[in-house]
Amino acid sequence: MKVGVTGASGYVGKKVVKELQNNSHEVFKFVRRSVKNEHEIYWSPSKQEIDIEKFEELDAIIHLAGESIAPKDLLGFLPFAGGRWSKERKSRIYWSRKWASDLFVSTFESAGNFPKIFITASGNDIYGDQGDKVVT
């Protein structure tokens, strides 16, 4: 299966890419810079640009891209992440997801052929055992 992954360079994305490759899927990474090889697909959510021809070749998309919600010091291995939840940071988080969602919606609407599987995760966190408490 040809699978496109956004956020492929992130903590979760790297693990997803490795697992897909270990299971013999052909992985295409969405990148916001010039592509370096045939397994990269250019996209720019903020500019609403995407390589539609490569997009149309995919069987599935796993969308993991977005501003990190992780604390800056999360176990010391996410130095790029986090900080206080200021208005500016909340805005970055919101727009990183909004622009990508808008781009995918418009691309799905205009594509002659499009992936039949679309999986998205916009953020995750660790809450620990909360017993019977509902966590949202």
Task: Tell me what each language-model feature is.
Residues 79, 85-91, 95, 99-136:
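Conserved Rossmann-fold NAD(P)-dependent oxidoreductase catalytic core, especially the SDR/UDP-sugar
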Residues 27-28, 40:
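Hydrophobic anchor at the start of a short beta-strand
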Residues 3-23:
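N-terminal Rossmann NAD(P)H-binding glycine-rich loop of SDR-like oxidoreductase domains
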Residues 6, 30, 61-64, 118-123:
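SDR active-site strand-loop-helix element
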Residues 30-34, 45:
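N-terminal Rossmann-fold cofactor-binding loop
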Residues 13, 70-72, 127-129:
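Glycine/Thr-rich phosphate-binding loops of Rossmann-like dinucleotide-binding domains
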Residues 42-103:
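NAD(P)H-binding glycine-rich loop region in Rossmannoid oxidoreductase-like domains
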Residues 2, 26-27, 116-117:
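Residues at the starts of beta-strands that form the adenosine-phosphate
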